[in-house]
UniProtKB/Swiss-Prot annotation:
Name used for this protein in its record: Chaperonin CPN60-2, mitochondrial
Compartmental location: Mitochondrion
Boundaries of the annotated transit peptide in chain numbering: 1-34
Keyword NAD: no
Natural source organism: Zea mays
GO cellular component, one term: mitochondrion
GO biological process terms, semicolon-separated: protein folding; protein refolding
Signal sequence bounds: none
SS bonds (residue pairs): none
Keywords assigned by UniProt, alphabetized: ATP-binding, Chaperone, Mitochondrion, Nucleotide-binding, Stress response, Transit peptide
Main location per the UniProt record: mitochondrion
Alphabetical list of CDD domains matching this protein: GroEL
Family to which this protein belongs: Belongs to the chaperonin (HSP60) family.
Gene3D superfamilies per the UniProt record, alphabetical: GroEL (3.50.7.10), GroEL-like equatorial domain (1.10.560.10), TCP-1-like chaperonin intermediate domain (3.30.260.10)
Length: 576
């Protein structure tokens, strides 16, 4: 292949600019499978990116606030999806124009990063990204230094985050937790109260999952279980491709404190599971080489439901976690310290549970088959260790183990009249649950976007090194008004008027209640936002926006023109 290519290249050089040279060059490019690139520079590059950012943000921002609208998304299969979830809308958007798509993809990156860190705030992050990047493009076009703008933006964000932390207040009561959940669920009180009840049942550190219900109503079910902070070792173990999870019903559980590398030991355990016609979960330090290959081949070719998960923790903490798991599931830890090895595993050494759900990040074990008395004794041992420990780190790890062992798992079963309704409600419940966890973690600030609005006033005092940095600070100052403006506009009110009224007065708890069309004390009215959500949305939006503002060239692939299908030959004996 390479000799042929070299020969063609030589012919191309000899042919000069002739038609033959062009043909040979074309054949050479084809032989190496090159994809042609298009390069955009400066103002043109940023303008095209901005169009992608604006169109995506405009589709997302209509969902913001209690009077935000739904977005209907066509799907390649099944019924259209109806949602008010910002990150779902953002993920569904692709543009034909490659450069526009670069801008849209970077906004998706902001939404995904905010969603991964805080679990909510994706719409706010998207709206802020558009506002910052729009002003940044104008400033660069006017001759400002892009790097100084970026420094000014960074300084302003740091100052705002410090100000927000000063506003924050911690929450503890069930009523406050319900308020946070209600706001994030677009004002649906029932969802907020359901989340508050779930946290009461399993504790703030407990595990709460969301599932489809079988009725028209939302239900709360608490199941004794444990969550491990490790996911599947290989994606080949996935059984539910839509959810990207491995789900095992009534599995046997092998628990080992060392690496599993021996293929023969794995085959023996697989035979036990096959004989009992049950799935198999392996929890070990690691599963490598032949052993992992054997499991994957049996999963793909023989259809045996199996999954391997790395044991959570390190050192002594890992051993303790495995012992907790063994007691919860009624099994034993296969450990060489007690003279045990995988070759001598017997069926009674394997644990069991009702269901296991494994994602790429974690494993939830529901309704373990362990003895209740043994589980309670183990929990008492951990409580005693917490009381006697003098190390804050050890106490934290012990309390985590106690929550996993005795807290159980709360399952929020979401009901509805149709699959589309259940899907839309699940999106809102997921947002509400994530926001509630964030609020418990870092505290709350007045909601409805007013925390960012009032923080913008403090930027007047910020000192900068030069004029361009000052413009960067002003970009953030203007962007911080956007969430309140958008929420008011979606409620059918003039956003600029609402922003102006709030900035004129001095009460930082006063805000605009879009649901009731009135100005209220946001905290007393229960309209609150988790600090973590607001902080993450601002930091992520500013980071990506300032990167886009300093972009000077974009390289994208030129789409290949597909050759038309060959014409069908005529059939003999037919007249046309």
């Amino acid at each position: 292949m390479y000799r042929a290519a070299a020969s063609l290249a030589s012919k191309a050089r000899q042919a000069g600019s002739s038609s033959a040279a062009r043909q040979v060059g074309s054949r050479l490019a084809w032989s190496r499978n090159y994809a042609a690139k298009d390069i955009k520079f400066g103002v043109e590059a940023r303008a095209l990116m901005l169009r992608g950012v604006e169109e995506l943000a405009d589709a997302v921002k209509v969902t913001m606030g209690p009077k935000g609208r739904n977005v209907v998304i066509e799907q390649s299969f099944g019924a259209p999806k109806v949602t008010k979830d910002g990150v779902t809308v953002a993920k569904s958007i692709e543009f034909k124009d490659r450069v526009k798509n670069v801008g849209a993809s970077l906004v998706k990156q902001v939404a995904n990063a905010t969603n991964d860190t805080a679990g909510d705030g994706t719409t706010c992050a998207t709206v802020l990204t558009k506002a910052i990047f729009t002003e940044g493009c104008k400033s660069v076009a006017a001759g400002m230094n892009a790097m100084d703008l970026r420094r000014g933006i960074s300084m302003a964000v740091d100052a705002v985050v410090t100000n927000l932390k000063g506003m924050a207040r911690m929450i503890s009561t069930s009523e406050e937790i319900a308020q946070v959940g209600t706001i994030s669920a677009n004002g649906e009180r029932e969802i907020g109260e359901l989340i508050a009840k779930a946290m009461e049942k399993v504790g703030k550190e407990g595990v709460i999952t969301i599932a489809d219900g079988n009725t028209l109503y939302n239900e709360l079910e608490v199941v004794e279980g444990m969550k491990l902070d490790r996911g599947y070792i290989s994606p080949y173990f996935i059984t539910n491709s839509k959810a990207q999870k491995c789900e095992l019903e009534d599995p046997l559980i092998l628990i080992h404190d060392k690496k599993v590398t021996n293929m023969h030991a794995v085959v023996k355990v697989l035979e036990m599971a096959l004989k009992k016609q049950r799935p198999l979960l392996i929890v070990a330090e690691d599963v490598e080489s032949e052993a992992l290959g054997t499991l994957i081949i049996n999963k793909l070719r023989a259809g045996i439901k199996v999954c391997a998960v790395k044991a959570p923790g390190f050192g002594e903490n890992r051993k303790a976690n495995l012992q907790d798991l063994a007691i919860l599931t009624g099994g034993e830890v296969i450990t060489e310290e007690l003279g045990m090895n995988l070759e001598n595993v017997e069926p009674h050494m394997l644990g069991s549970c009702k269901k296991v759900t494994v994602s790429k990040d974690d494993t939830v074990i529901l309704d373990g088959a362990g003895d209740k008395k043994s589980i309670e004794e183990r929990a008492d041992q951990i409580r005693s260790a917490v009381e006697n420990s003098t190390s804050d780190y050890d106490k934290e790890k012990l309390q985590e183990r106690l929550a996993k062992l005795s807290g159980g798992v709360a399952v929020l079963k979401i009901g509805g009249a149709s699959e589309a309704e259940v899907g839309e409600k699940k999106d809102r419940v997921t947002d509400a649950l994530n926001a509630t966890k964030a609020a418990v973690e870092e505290g709350i600030v007045p909601g409805g976007g007013v925390a960012l609005l009032y923080a913008s006033k403090e930027l007047d005092k910020l000192q900068t090194a030069n004029f361009d940095q000052k413009i960067g600070v002003q970009i953030i100052q203007n962007a911080l008004k956007t969430p309140v403006h958008t929420i008011a506009s979606n409620a059918g009110v003039e956003g600029a008027v609402v922003v102006g009224k709030l900035l004129e007065q001095g009460n930082t708890d006063l805000g605009y209640d879009a649901a009731k069309d009135e100005y209220v004390d946001m905290v007393k009215a229960g309209i609150i936002d988790p600090l973590k959500v607001i902080r993450t949305a601002l930091v992520d939006a500013a980071s990506v926006s300032s990167l886009m503002t300093t972009t000077e060239s974009i390289i994208v692939e030129i789409p290949k023109e597909e050759a038309p299908a060959p014409a069908m030959g005529g059939m003999g004996g037919m007249d046309y």
